[in-house]
UniProtKB/Swiss-Prot annotation:
Protein name as catalogued: Potassium-transporting ATPase KdpC subunit
Bilayer topology: Single-pass membrane protein
Gene that this sequence comes from: kdpC
Gene Ontology MF terms in the entry: ATP binding; P-type potassium transmembrane transporter activity
Pfam families associated with the record: KdpC
UniProt KW keywords: ATP-binding, Cell inner membrane, Cell membrane, Ion transport, Membrane, Nucleotide-binding, Potassium, Potassium transport, Transmembrane, Transmembrane helix, Transport
Stretches that traverse the bilayer: 10-30
GO cellular component annotations of the record: plasma membrane
Amino acid sequence: MKNLFSLLKLTVFTLILFAVIYPLAIYGIAKLAPNQGKGETISVNGKVVGYQKIGQKFDKSNYFWGRPSAVDYNAAGSAGSNKGPSNADYLALVQKRIDTLLLVHPYLKKSDIPVDMVTASGSGLDPNISPQGALIQVKRIAKERMLDEAKVKSLVESKINTAVVGPETVNVLELNVALDQLK
């Protein structure tokens, strides 16, 4: 009976700790974060067009394309594909993405394509690409929008985020919003 009472106390304690105290602590911490933990929105003319930390699908030729998504940019189903580099289906999918990039960007060589442009991230919702991933698309964007290539390249360079730790990145949504404002 003593053991049963001890186990019951432990169960109630862990239930209160993990079902009440921990969620309230996380909620309190989130309230201290920018935008009270609701996510950092990107707005155009007062209308929210997306979130800074969640990738979106851009497939029109006059926009910069982001990283491929294993979940077709479905935030509710955030996940990677779980297919490794030895999986034949995965290799075929990566090759298809390479072929598509080479077809749309005939001036590129296979070796010019950065890995992040043909592989999905672990979350499937990565909002960023490498600066090289953006720069290889400059010629296509400039042609589609009838803009000076140097102007588009300068825009990309102005949107490169340098992290204290980790690689430089470019947020695709922020870049495309700025691109729409470019004249």
